C-alpha cells in the first residue's frame, strides 16, 4: 500500500510539472498563446488577404465571383450582391480599401443580409454568429442603442485584440426598397495607413 501511495505521489508530481510547463506556454508570448492568437486573427475574407492592394483584390474577386456589381470610381470599394461565402448566401458584400497616396490596402469587408423585419434581421444575425463562433473562441456580447444584441470577436491582422470583426444588426434610418434592417458581419476597418509625426 505504501508503494502504491508513493507511486501515486510520483505520478502527481510529474503531472504537476507538465501542467506547470504547459501554463508557461499560455503566458503572453508563450507557444500555446501565440498559436491561439494566430487562430483568432482575421487574415482574409473571400480568399483576399487583408492588406491586399485594390488591384490584387479585384482580380481575386473577379475569378471567384465574376464582374463586380459596383466599382467606385476612386477605387475604394468593390461591391457584389447575392454571392455565397462560407456556405452562406449574402445579399450584399463590400470590400473597402484605404489609400496612402501610393498604395492601397483592403482594410474592411462587410457581408450581410437586407431584412424587412427586426425578427428576420435577428435570425440572420444569429445564423452569421453561429457560423463565426465555430472558428473564434473568444468574444464579447453587447446590446446596442436599438436593443439588438451584437458580438465582437477575433483579432486584427495588424496585431492586438479587439476590432477583429463584429456581427450585428443595423437599423436603417430610411427604408431601402422595403428593407429596414441589415444583419452583417463586418471585418475591420483596420488602419493600414499610419500617419504620425
Please state what every model-predicted region is.
Residues 1-4, 20:
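Positively charged n-region of N-terminal signal peptides that target proteins for export
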Residues 2, 30-33, 78-81:
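Short secondary-structure boundary micro-motifs
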Residues 4-15:
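Sec-dependent N-terminal signal peptides
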Residues 6, 91, 104-107, 177-181:
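Residues at beta-strand starts and edge strands
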Residues 20-73, 108-197:
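Non-cytosolic coordination micro-motifs
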Residues 74-119:
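Mid-chain, structured segments of secreted extracytoplasmic proteins
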Amino acid at each position: 500500500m505504501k508503494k502504491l501511495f508513493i507511486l501515486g505521489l510520483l505520478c502527481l508530481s510529474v503531472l504537476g510539472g507538465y501542467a506547470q510547463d504547459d501554463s508557461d506556454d499560455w503566458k503572453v508570448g508563450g507557444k500555446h498563446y501565440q498559436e491561439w492568437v494566430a487562430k483568432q486573427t482575421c487574415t482574409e475574407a473571400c480568399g483576399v488577404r487583408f492588406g491586399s492592394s485594390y488591384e490584387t483584390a479585384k482580380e481575386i474577386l473577379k475569378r471567384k465571383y465574376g464582374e463586380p456589381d459596383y466599382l467606385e470610381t476612386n477605387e475604394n470599394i468593390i461591391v457584389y450582391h447575392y454571392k455565397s461565402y462560407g456556405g452562406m448566401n449574402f445579399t450584399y458584400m463590400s470590400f473597402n480599401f484605404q489609400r496612402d497616396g501610393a498604395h492601397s490596402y483592403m482594410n474592411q469587408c462587410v457581408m450581410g443580409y437586407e431584412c424587412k423585419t427586426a425578427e428576420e434581421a435577428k435570425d440572420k444575425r444569429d445564423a452569421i454568429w453561429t457560423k463565426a463562433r465555430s472558428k473564434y473562441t473568444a468574444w464579447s456580447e453587447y446590446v446596442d442603442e436599438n436593443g439588438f444584441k451584437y458580438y465582437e470577436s477575433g483579432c486584427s491582422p495588424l496585431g492586438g485584440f479587439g476590432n477583429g470583426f463584429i456581427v450585428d444588426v443595423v437599423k436603417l434610418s430610411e427604408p431601402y426598397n422595403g428593407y429596414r434592417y441589415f444583419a452583417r458581419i463586418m471585418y475591420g476597418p483596420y488602419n493600414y495607413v499610419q500617419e504620425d509625426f
